[in-house]
Swiss-Prot record:
The modification Phosphothreonine is found at T169, T415, T450, T452, T482, T484. It catalyses: L-seryl-[protein] + ATP = O-phospho-L-seryl-[protein] + ADP + H(+); L-threonyl-[protein] + ATP = O-phospho-L-threonyl-[protein] + ADP + H(+). Residues 13-265 form the Protein kinase domain. The gene is melk. Autophosphorylated: autophosphorylation of the T-loop at Thr-169 and Ser-173 is required for activation. Phosphorylated by the maturation promoting factor (MPF), composed of cdk1 and a cyclin-B. Also phosphorylated by some MAPK. Phosphorylated during oocyte maturation. Dephosphorylation destabilizes the protein. Degraded when cells exit mitosis. Residues 472-484 have a biased composition (Basic and acidic residues). Coiled coil: none annotated. It comes from Xenopus tropicalis. ATP binds at I19, G20, T21, G22, G23, F24, A25, K26, V27, K42. It is found in: Cell membrane. Activated by autophosphorylation of the T-loop at Thr-169 and Ser-173: in contrast to other members of the SNF1 subfamily, phosphorylation at Thr-169 is not mediated by STK11/LKB1 but via autophosphorylation instead. This is Maternal embryonic leucine zipper kinase.
Length: 652
């Protein structure tokens, strides 16, 4: 875990705070130096990935080949001896799930807006030969303009046999899985996605799942029966659409093609859902080419040719981010970075990668790596090395809508499935190579490293330390800190607590566990916590504008987003004390640092079942005090119920 791993990355990006983290990956907010645009950088450790390393190919290949207004955009891929960096579109609005929590449930008009965007994204990926196979609110991010972006393609499948190819792998989240998957039958990926979309639509409009139970086998029986409650507030049109998607027999389910112009989705709209991409990969913008050629002192012809190679190197990233600026109405201009010790880049020649990204041909059966399902180590979450973060939302707007027709999606039934537990060595028979004609090399194996012992954990659980309210620090310094364990989310107000009868929870287990012996389950990913924390500190020192010795003494000022609950309490210390008093009664352990409480729950056997953060904050445009809530690990619906219970007990 040498700093050398970050050398290439730091040529082009300034790293900010950690906004998501896990056992083998973390996500950092960053700024692209030449455009100034914000990006999210997913940092994966090869050693921690282990046998899942080849499965990174599934995620990266899919994102290289998918370019759509409702799919999260990949900008840049960097490989070093120990790390893989994926530079992605930054979506500050957080998970769609947070929006559901804030609203309790969505009105049909709100749900229709979001669901049209979901249908658009899914229809597009099906038309490209992919099935997502892990559709759920946690895998949909909201941008600054309330538009959705589909993420997490680690379980996607592109069958070698085409869209009619039947799949066998059982994967995804149990509560969203189609009956044919949990029965272990061969299935068509696109049909399974339609079922998941039905569950997702129900969750949007009801605020809870149609099929849910503590016991996974009971949950499976409910799914296979296909019977669910129909709340009185649902309109006849929405009830009909749900029944058409949640058909136990996949052949009776509505197709994506018919979804595009379904009467419920057309209500209030003059045209069917627009599924085609607004920015196909073949298109190169002339204004962006001109700016890049002038900036790097290269001919327009050479610049256009380099962009058209779509190598997902810094050239690709610079072009895509510059084009994003143009779509926002911003000036199409690049700025020359002058980082300490860096020489300005003067030509594209200097930007060409020293080596291309290498992939390893999958030889580990049907193992799948899910980027969005990060596991957290207790040492990392409850460590002494805790910092705060503050950032301003900023994300590209959606392109202007245009009319389009859908041609062949309903003939795109199948998509592959990849198991997390299978460890036998065999070819990946379901996924065809998404990057035809591109490098067929393999990921380089990680270089040997010498482990460094962890530092002692001196934090004590459940100890309240009232922050010093007399000291103040400038807001601009907060955004330069490099904190840990805070995924992207935003939110407004928590309202309309779910009724007591909604107490059953979704089971966040591998679907595979129903069909496989426990000896086949893979071991937990290793976490190099102390090494990562030390590296974060080194990066903080090396990155310009980082300030040593920064400490926050008062509550942060935040915008009233979807994951911030407003309260009627004006004193932040009083609110903090109320939360601390309530947590033990809910069997929640916590570690406090300033105004943030890092919380976790455990099973009777000591296994961590839930990890989340509660932070007392000041709302930036008022004198009101709020609570920022953030799920880090565990079932999303159990988290929703628990946080609502805590806030209700605090009487905020």
């Amino acid at each position: 875990m040498a700093v050398d791993d970050y050398e290439e990355l730091l040529k082009y990006y300034e790293l900010h705070e950690t906004i998501g983290t896990g056992g083998f990956a973390k996500v950092k907010l960053a700024s692209h130096l030449t455009t100034g645009e914000k990006v999210a950088i997913k940092i994966m450790d090869k050693e921690s990935l282990g046998d899942d390393l080849p499965r990174v190919k599934t995620e990266i290949d899919a994102m290289k080949n998918l370019s759509h207004q409702h799919v999260c955009r990949l900008y840049h891929v960097i490989e070093t001896p120990n790390k893989i960096f994926m530079v992605l579109e930054y979506c500050p609005g957080g998970e769609l799930f947070d929006y559901i929590i804030a609203k309790d449930r969505l009105t049909e008009d709100e749900a229709r807006v979001f669901f049209r965007q979901i249908v658009s994204a899914v229809a597009y990926i099906h038309s490209q030969g992919y099935a997502h196979r892990d559709l759920k609110p946690e895998n949909l991010l909201i941008d600054e303009d309330q538009n959705l972006k589909l993420i997490d393609f680690g379980l996607c499948a592109k069958p070698k046999g085409g869209l009619d190819y039947h799949l066998m792998t059982c994967c995804g989240s149990p509560a969203y899985a189609a009956p044919e998957l949990i029965q272990g039958k061969a299935y068509i990926g696109s049909e399974a996605d339609i079922w998941s979309m039905g569950v997702l639509m129900y969750a949007l409009m009801c605020g809870y799942l149609p099929f849910d139970d503590d016991n996974v086998m009971v949950l499976y029986k409910k799914i296979m029966r296909g019977k669910y409650e129909i709340p009185k507030w649902l309109s006849p049109g929405s009830v009909l659409l749900l029944s058409q998607m949640l058909q136990v027999d996949p052949k009776k389910r509505i197709s994506v093609k018919h979804l595009l112009s379904h009467p419920w989705l057309m209500q209030g709209y003059s045209c069917p859902v627009e599924w085609q991409s607004k920015y196909p990969l073949g298109y190169v913008d002339e204004d962006c080419v001109t700016e890049l050629s002038v900036f790097y002192k290269c001919s327009r012809t050479s610049t256009s040719r380099l962009i058209s190679e779509w190598n997902y190197d810094h050239i690709t990233a610079s072009y895509l981010l510059l084009h994003s600026k143009k779509s926002h109405g911003k000036p199409v201009r690049l700025k020359r970075p002058l980082a300490v010790g860096d020489q300005p880049v003067t030509s594209f020649k200097e930007l060409r990668p020293k080596s291309t990204l290498d992939f390893e041909e999958p030889n580990c059966g049907e193992i799948a790596y899910v980027f969005g399902s990060m596991e957290f180590s207790d040492d990392e979450l409850f460590s002494e090395d805790f910092a705060y973060s503050c950032f301003e939302p900023h994300t590209p707007k959606e392109y202007v809508k245009g009319r389009s027709e859908f041609h062949s999606v309903d003939s795109a039934p199948s998509t592959p499935v990849v198991q997390r537990y299978a460890r036998h060595k065999s070819e990946d028979k379901e996924n065809c190579d998404a990057a035809l004609g591109k490098d067929e090399n393999v990921f380089l194996h990680p270089a040997p490293w010498t482990p460094t012992p962890r530092r002692k954990q001196n934090e004590k659980k459940g100890i309240l330390t009232t922050p010093n309210k007399n000291s103040h620090t400038k807001e601009k310094n907060q955004s330069k800190e490099t904190p840990t364990k805070k995924p992207i989310t935003t939110g407004e107000e928590l309202a309309n607590v779910i009724s007591p009868e909604r107490r059953c929870r979704s089971v966040e287990l591998d679907l595979n566990q129903a069909h496989v012996d426990s000896a086949q389950k893979k071991k937990g990913a290793k976490v190099f916590g102390s090494l990562e924390r030390g590296l974060d500190k080194m990066i903080t020192m090396l990155t310009p504008s980082k300030r040593k010795g920064y400490a926050r003494e008062g509550p942060r000022k935040l915008r009233a987003h979807y994951n911030v609950t407003t309260t009627n309490i004006m004193n932040p210390e009083q609110l903090l004390n109320q939360i601390v008093k309530v947590l033990p009664s809910k069997n929640v352990d916590y570690v406090q640092k300033g105004y943030t409480l890092k919380c976790k729950t455990q099973s009777d056997f000591g296994k961590v079942t839930m990890q989340f953060e509660l932070e007392v904050c000041q709302l930036s445009k008022s004198e009101m005090v709020g609570i920022r809530r953030q799920r880090l690990k565990g079932d999303a619906w159990v988290y929703k119920r628990l946080v609502e219970d805590i806030l209700s007990s605090c009487k905020v």
